[in-house]
């Protein structure tokens, strides 16, 4: 992204389920100084279009399962972001609508990218939106300090050891996965992904990966 001029303060939007690429975005986009905007895949196109416009997205990364939704959302937004298609081999597939694929974008990257920590810990790291049940969605900004504090708090509250095995049943787009992308990575843990949580998938992950931690809404 830096090779394409994306930098500090630019909003990079994401429409994707729980997949490894979403985690990579949660780590890489803030390292760029840009702002991660992970979006709820269950929202309608008009609402997503409002978010893309209001959040001033310059880049949109989209899992091809949601390509039709993303195309319509962009048409509602009045913006012309760089669209990057994520093709998950375990997903149902879908049409490419972007200028390039996610893997193609990675191939453009500079292996010697010079990471520079934020000059101000209050710089924006992520931009989330409320569900908009009483009107238009409202933007909520996470700072680097806020995300770090929440990530550390997860460790303290759960008394988490090093090397946990975390099952992603909570959407990464929900409050940035409650900051567990950074918590688990900080602890040198293992991330186990489920595109769509189900009883079979959850219990199967328990058996296959010896899961130690997970989060979820009451329905999970």
Task: List the model feature ranges, each with a label.
Residues 148-165, 173-213, 219:
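Conserved AMP-binding/adenylation subdomain of ANL enzymes
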Residues 17, 62-71, 170, 197-198, ...:
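Adenylate-forming
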Residues 125-149:
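Conserved AMP-binding A3 loop
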Residues 3-4, 24-27, 31-104:
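Structural core segment of the AMP-binding/adenylate-forming
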Residues 12-14:
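Gly/Thr-rich phosphate-binding loop signature of adenosyl cofactor/nucleotide-binding cores
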Residues 33, 133, 188:
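Conserved G/P- and acidic residue-centered "switch" motifs that form tight phosphate/ATP-binding loops
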Residues 16-27, 42-46, 169-187, 197:
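Conserved coil-to-alpha-helix start sites within the AMP-binding
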Residues 98-99, 108-129, 136, 159-165:
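Conserved pre-ATP/AMP-binding loop-to-beta segment of ANL
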